Swiss-Prot record:
Name recorded for this polypeptide: 2S seed storage albumin protein
Function per UniProt: This is a 2S seed storage protein. Has antifungal activity. Inhibits spore germination in H.sativum (IC(50)=62.5 ug/ml) and P.betae (IC(50)=62.5 ug/ml). Inhibits growth of H.sativum, V.albo-atrum and P.infestans.
Disulfide bonds: C7-C42, C19-C31
Any coiled-coil regions, as ranges: none
Amino acid sequence: PVSRQQCSQRIQGERFNQCRSQMQDGQLQSCCQELQNVEEQCQC
């Protein structure tokens, strides 16, 4: 599986601004589904 850091580095574009903000706030669970929709190997 891909690490959280690697997954966060893959999140680019305006549609993921909220996702990045949640990760910075430590709300990884809120971001996890969105990450997995883009990169199935991402594990949160």
